[in-house]
Amino acid sequence: MSQNNIHEHRILILDFGSQYTQLIARRIREIGVYCEVEPWDIDVEDIVKFGARGIILSGGPETVTGDNAPVAPVEVFELGVPVLGICYGMQTMAEQLGGKVINATEHEYGYAQVRAHGHTKLLNDIEDHVTPEGYGMLDVWMSHGDRVDKMPEGFKLMASTGNCPIAGMANEEKDFYGIQFHPEVTHTTQGQRMIERFVVDLCGCEKLWTTENIIDDSIARIRQQVGSDEVLLGLSGGVDSSVVAALLHKAIGDQLTCVFVDHGLLRHQEGDQVMSMFAENMGIKVIRVDAEDYFMNALAGEADPEKKRKIIGHAFIEMFDQESAKLTGVKWLAQGTIYPDVIESAGSKTGKAKVIKSHHNVGGLPEDMKLELLEPLRELFKDEVRRLGVALGLPSDMVYRHPFPGPGLGVRILGEVKKEYADILRLADHIFIEELRAADLYDKTSQAFTVFLPVKSVGVVGDARRYDYVVSLRAVETIDFMTARWAHLPYDFLEKVSNRIINEIPRITRVTYDISSKPPATIEWE
């Protein structure tokens, strides 16, 4: 399938600063339609050039009635395509088209019930339940202080709540719709149906954005971009670089060389697993750099978390540079940049340069390398990357593995990093993860790991007193990693893990369980 086809039916989301904006985009992608997120003050020429079949105005933290409130470019309402305003997006639509927005005396945050009115094209036949009087009701998620007090000319009432008489409005002649609630969050139970109604039925988008089509499209573009040139990839064993490796190998075969820097701070047998998966099973050219001694020497005596991160980052770059300098024919450097990196680096007018954050697996690159950048995942969200990985033949337990920090165990060993500590921690962490999988709890937690504490504690083994190290288990549940709850793992499970760690690892005398949520604690300890 050609590049134009898969991107042809597309939606543009103008971002007014909502924490849920990326969620809107992910919901549209899940339907099978391509979309992009741009700042609300994007240049008008870019909006026209984008060629959207429909436009969505996101929510946002500002008040429409305030000075310098962000507004949609007026041309949005003149392009002749359907427009959906969500929360703030509805309010700015109302205000810009001649309606009126006021600061509501009753603010609405959280669950609400909305009554649908008028059998509009957007909400017709979409309901959670029906009242005895025959009114269709929707269970939704609200988050607003302002509300529309007067609709613009040509609009009719589409939805209301007890506190918000105009919770939805529609100009069906122009296909302009505004809803005060958030269809993109799971708490709005019919939200995905509403988004699909807008994107597919009202905007006329076909479902071309599928995993198979994305792979075909990516391969065609990589081949077109690279030609017969050689490509270099820093392979970390993480999800993004692993999927890039699999995709590039499928596209260009032996033109790809991966450099895998093993810094001695990986998980149990992870280095061997990376080599087994990519070099042996898939036949990819992988250069493994055994750099444990180099990293341990660089980290010796340093206890400050930020300085440790910088030391590990610099050491990684040095090792990568040394190896890549030996590869004379390479023209391209591949990276695992994904779409959230791109969105987060493009602010509104204040910083519209669209500079991509240096999310380099390889840190900074030496200027004399002069490599072109290849970022085959830069259009994809993390969940799309994972689906791509499975479709490309990577094992799902690798693709859906819990997040692991770039500095690895270096930030899970509190204080100074030593080889002895890393070896102890690796084994303890392996036991914890192994038991989580055996108890079918691994996929029920969002992230789980073990932390090595730089303290000793008294224990008794047999009749002997022992004075040795302490580790802490950490497991959390989260949707977005912005907030997280400590995982309420069963006591008998924790007891089993603790017993195994203390019995099987001679240098550990005590196991604790971290019951801190985020906030105030962070997920990682350093």
Swiss-Prot record:
<dbReference type="InterPro" id="IPR017926">
    <property type="entry name" value="GATASE"/>
</dbReference>
<dbReference type="GO" id="GO:0003921">
    <property type="term" value="F:GMP synthase activity"/>
</dbReference>
<feature type="domain" description="Glutamine amidotransferase type-1">
    <location>
        <begin position="10"/>
        <end position="208"/>
    </location>
</feature>
<protein>
    <recommendedName>
        <fullName>GMP synthase [glutamine-hydrolyzing]</fullName>
        <ecNumber>6.3.5.2</ecNumber>
    </recommendedName>
</protein>
<feature type="active site">
    <location>
        <position position="182"/>
    </location>
</feature>
<keyword id="KW-0658">Purine biosynthesis</keyword>
<comment type="function">
    <text>Catalyzes the synthesis of GMP from XMP.</text>
</comment>
<keyword id="KW-0436">Ligase</keyword>
<keyword id="KW-0332">GMP biosynthesis</keyword>
<dbReference type="Pfam" id="PF00958">
    <property type="entry name" value="GMP_synt_C"/>
</dbReference>
<dbReference type="InterPro" id="IPR014729">
    <property type="entry name" value="Rossmann-like_a/b/a_fold"/>
</dbReference>
<dbReference type="Pfam" id="PF02540">
    <property type="entry name" value="NAD_synthase"/>
</dbReference>
<comment type="subunit">
    <text>Homodimer.</text>
</comment>
<feature type="binding site">
    <location>
        <begin position="236"/>
        <end position="242"/>
    </location>
    <ligand>
        <name>ATP</name>
    </ligand>
</feature>
<keyword id="KW-0547">Nucleotide-binding</keyword>
<dbReference type="InterPro" id="IPR025777">
    <property type="entry name" value="GMPS_ATP_PPase_dom"/>
</dbReference>
<feature type="active site">
    <location>
        <position position="184"/>
    </location>
</feature>
<dbReference type="InterPro" id="IPR029062">
    <property type="entry name" value="Class_I_gatase-like"/>
</dbReference>
<keyword id="KW-0067">ATP-binding</keyword>
<keyword id="KW-0315">Glutamine amidotransferase</keyword>
<comment type="pathway">
    <text>Purine metabolism; GMP biosynthesis; GMP from XMP (L-Gln route): step 1/1.</text>
</comment>
<dbReference type="GO" id="GO:0005829">
    <property type="term" value="C:cytosol"/>
</dbReference>
<dbReference type="InterPro" id="IPR001674">
    <property type="entry name" value="GMP_synth_C"/>
</dbReference>
<feature type="active site" description="Nucleophile">
    <location>
        <position position="87"/>
    </location>
</feature>
<dbReference type="InterPro" id="IPR004739">
    <property type="entry name" value="GMP_synth_GATase"/>
</dbReference>
<dbReference type="GO" id="GO:0005524">
    <property type="term" value="F:ATP binding"/>
</dbReference>
<dbReference type="InterPro" id="IPR022955">
    <property type="entry name" value="GMP_synthase"/>
</dbReference>
<dbReference type="Pfam" id="PF00117">
    <property type="entry name" value="GATase"/>
</dbReference>
<dbReference type="InterPro" id="IPR022310">
    <property type="entry name" value="NAD/GMP_synthase"/>
</dbReference>
<feature type="domain" description="GMPS ATP-PPase">
    <location>
        <begin position="209"/>
        <end position="401"/>
    </location>
</feature>
